Amino acid sequence: MSWQAYVDDHLMCEIEGNHLSAAAIIGHDGVVWAQSATFPQVKPEEITGIMNDFNEPGSLAPTGLYLGGTKYMVIQGEPGAVIRGKKGPGGVTIKKTTMALIIGIYDEPMAPGQCNMIVERLGDYLLEQGF
């Protein structure tokens, strides 16, 4: 299966009538493996900040999480494994695997828990597969 198929079929899938606004799979080095048409252009320093927070949990909390120039308030995640961010009625979930970052961006009416489930389920599967 191509990385694009993982984005299209597993991240942008419909769940209870809702779906993510945007999604991507990005390597730890910031290289985009696959993304939805709506995923924002990320800056290298944004990926560096995210990777730093996985290595030193809490480092993004004071400044916020930036993705495509949009600032998200960092909320409770799983240190070293999942970063969650909130902006108004929407937000972002980022799951770290061995080689990649699985990123899902959502907005109302999708609930944060639905985004978490979609992103973390694919992330867990890819971890099991060695990615």
Swiss-Prot record:
PROSITE patterns referenced in this protein's UniProt entry, alphabetically: PROFILIN (PS00414)
Molecular functions (GO terms): actin monomer binding
Chief location: cytoplasm
Lineage, opening ranks: Eukaryota, Viridiplantae, Streptophyta, Embryophyta, Tracheophyta
InterPro entries: PFN, PFN_euk, PFN_sf, Profilin_CS
Pfam families for this protein: Profilin
Subunit structure and binding partners: Occurs in many kinds of cells as a complex with monomeric actin in a 1:1 ratio.
Matches recorded under SUPFAM superfamilies: Profilin (actin-binding protein)
A cellular component term, taken from the record's GO annotations: cytoskeleton
Location within or outside the cell: Cytoplasm, Cytoskeleton
Function: Binds to actin and affects the structure of the cytoskeleton. At high concentrations, profilin prevents the polymerization of actin, whereas it enhances it at low concentrations. By binding to PIP2, it inhibits the formation of IP3 and DG.
Protein name per the record: Profilin-2
Keywords: Actin-binding, Allergen, Cytoplasm, Cytoskeleton
Organism per entry: Ambrosia artemisiifolia (Common ragweed)
Disulfide bonds, paired cysteine numbers: none
Top-level taxon in the UniProt lineage: Eukaryota
Family of the protein in this entry: Belongs to the profilin family.
Record Gene3D superfamilies: Dynein light chain 2a, cytoplasmic
